[in-house]
Structures are given as structure tokens and as C-alpha cells.
Amino acid sequence: MTDIDYKLEAVPATRIAADDIDKTFRSSTIDLISGALGGKVLGFSDEWFAEAANLLTPTAPIRQPGKMVYTGAWYDGWETRRHNPAEFDWVVIRLGVASGTVEGVEIDTAFFNGNHAPAISVEGCFSQNDDEVLSWKGERGGWETILGVQECGPSQRFGWKLENPTKKQYTHVRLNMYPDGGIARFRLFGHAVPVFPDNTDAIFDLAAAQNGGVAISCSDQHFGTKDNLILPGRGKDMGDGWETARSRTKGHVDWTIIRLGAPGYIQNFMVDTAHFRGNYPQQVKLQAIEWKSEGEPGADSEGWTEVVEPIKCGPDQEHPVESLVKDKPFTHVKLIIVPDGGVKRLRVFAKRAV
């Protein structure tokens, strides 16, 4: 689209195929605006047909053919009126973390066909004042380009990886939709930039996504994804935890590896099986490693240290356990479940190793 008066910087970005979006971003970044993480829609130009807040829903869009509401057909996404007199509709979102740097963007137009967004762009800013950000509405204000104008199509996932991840941190983003239409989901992949306590003896959850933790790999995530382990709160049901398939092999275990937000001296853990009542693991083990090599550690890398005695699990409860190794810094934690099952959250309470 070349006939847009509101000019944006041409930020170099590579289009990612729909089937490659998850493997490109999900093992190294988090969705900075996920509703599960605390991302919040602060304002929008219009949401006549479907609410802008749906953009941040962590689960995939759904369709309910034939379902009608006051405004027309029901859609699981954000949809605005036709015939927008402005160049674009917009929605302003506050990140679910204190601030973050950005590596990529996903726009999903699932089930929007004939009413999908023809094109989008993404802008960001750093501000501690929500009201100031909202006052810019659809104007330039203090917005900076994260992703320039990109064309979209009907009912599919679109991904873009920035050639150079942003060095600047952002607290808010604005999604612009040209000129109007519908988008089901918006993901902003990147890294949380946490605000750590000044007191180096402070103990806090270094696995939490808000504190820079990332779930980098796992053996299986058939029913619930590994990323859920490091979300805030205790969730709402079995669907927002990590759950693996039933195993049929003797001696089987499942595992997931979490990179801590900073190297730390681990003091204790909390393993939470909230909502898992007939499918919790029989036992949980925890290992940690100080990884100094390139890339990320694998499940079989040398150097993993047992940091707790095996934990016998129960249904729908928190399991606090003290670390056996408090004087050694670690960068990653491996949660091992025996033989399989579901865990809602893993907390790793530690002092930063500075």
C-alpha cells in the first residue's frame, strides 16, 4: 500500500511462513502483550463488531458458524465498522511486562474472510503515563515504528521477524489496521526487561516471564504449553498449565527447561498442580545448571545438578520445597515430571548472582 499519508519507517523484516511462526519465536521469546501475562488494551478507534481485547487472548481463535449478536455475526477477534474515514483504525496496548524489546510480530486473521484487515503496522513507545499515550489517539505523538506497513490476507497467520531486534525498550504498542476490518489475534514476540530490586539479597521469582524467564524447550506439550508454567497467578482451569500426553513406556519421564531472567542463587521452589486433579505427576524432580556455552542447554547436557529431593505430588495444590544448593549460581532450571501429567506453575525463588 503506497497511498498512505501517515508515513512509517521501513524497518527491515522477514516474512515467516505460518507453519514456522511457533518454532521461530516460541522457544526463545515470549508474547509480551498476552492477556495471560497481563497485557491490556487501553484504547481503540472502534470495536463495533468485535472487541479489541480479543486480540490478546492466548489461545487460538475459534469459530461459531451461525452465531449472531446485536451487531451481526459473532467473531473471535477485533472488528471495526466499514467505511473508516481515517487512514487506519488503531488499538493501544500496554505490555504485560514492565518493558520489553521486540523480535517479531504475528497477525492472525483466522475466520475473517471478506472482512479481514488488508494491511497493518505496529508502533511502540516508552512511557510511564497511560493517559499521555492515549491522548495521541491515531496521531504521531511519541510513537516509533516497530514494523512498517505489511499486507495481510483472509483467514491465515502472518509472521514477521525483525532483521534487527529492537534495542529500545517499549511499554506500549499501537496496532494500526488499514483502513478497517478484522484481526483475530496479535502477538508481539520479544524479551521482558524486568526492573530488579536494588537490594541484591532480595528473593524473587527468577523464572517468571515478567522477570525475564523463558521456557526454552520441553519433551512434550500435548495438552498445555510449557510457556504457561511461568505465567502470573494460578490460572483459571486445566487449560492454562503444562500438560503432557499419557506415557505407555516403563521409566518414561517428561521435562521442560526454563532459562532464568538472570543468573541466581536459588533458595526455594514452588511446584503448583492447581486444577490438575486426576492427571498430576506422581513425582517431580528439579535440576539446575550454570550454562556458559553457546546456545542453550539440552536435557542431556553435562552439568545438570539435582537441587531438591524428589517431590511426591498431590492434586490441585502448591508444593513448596527448599533448594539443597543455595551457594552456587544457576542460569537454567529443568523440571522433570514422573512419568507424565500436568503442572500449572513453577516458581524459582532466588537471589540474583551479581
UniProtKB/Swiss-Prot annotation:
It catalyses: allantoate + H2O = (S)-ureidoglycolate + urea. GO terms for molecular function: allantoicase activity. The keyword Transferase does not apply. InterPro entries: Allantoicase, Allantoicase_dom, Galactose-bd-like_sf. Keywords: Hydrolase, Purine metabolism. One of its GO terms (biological process) is purine nucleobase metabolic process. Belongs to the allantoicase family. Utilization of purines as secondary nitrogen sources, when primary sources are limiting. This is Allantoicase. It comes from Neurospora crassa (strain ATCC 24698 / 74-OR23-1A / CBS 708.71 / DSM 1257 / FGSC 987).
